[in-house]
Amino acid sequence: MYKRQVLDSVPSTKEAEELTNLAKKENLNADVFGPLAFDNSISKKSAEIKGIKNVVAGDADVLLVPNVEAGNALVKIMVYFMGACAAGVVVGGKVPIVITSRSDVATARLASIAAAVVALD
């Protein structure tokens, strides 16, 4: 049986556990589970091998990272090694803010604008 690795020495694991517990408490209309390593988040086979039984394991729609550096690295890996199109939007203020990289292609810039428009609703 898989036991989530929540370690005092790794603050992001404690934060992931707190988010999981908060999601349960607030009865969100979403499945939230963590901490999960990247492979267990995106690979059902990896999660299965490690005995992780959760609907999120291997089928995550959203990945949360512990800091901006980790998030930036993850996005760049997905863009440059996996051919992903990244869109960036900051929400929570009066209006959404479009975030782009200086090296973004036109498709990524347009995707960010489209995501901001959707966030307006």
Which residues fall in each region the model found?
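Structural signal for hydrophobic packing residues in well-ordered secondary-structure cores
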Residues: T20-N27, M82, A116-L120
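C-terminal functional extensions of proteins
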Residues: I77, A84-D121
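Active-site rim loops that border cofactor/substrate pockets in soluble metabolic enzymes
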Residues: L7-D61
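A C-terminal functional module that forms or caps the active site or interfaces directly
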Residues: A47-G93
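Short, small-residue-biased leader/transition segments that mark boundaries at the very start
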Residues: M1-Y2
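Conserved strand-to-helix beginnings and helix N-cap segments that scaffold or border functional pockets
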Residues: S9-T13, V75, R109-L110
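General beta-strand structural signal in soluble alpha/beta enzymes
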Residues: D31-P35, P66, V91, I99
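Short active-site-adjacent structural elements
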Residues: S41-I42, G71-K76, A106-A108
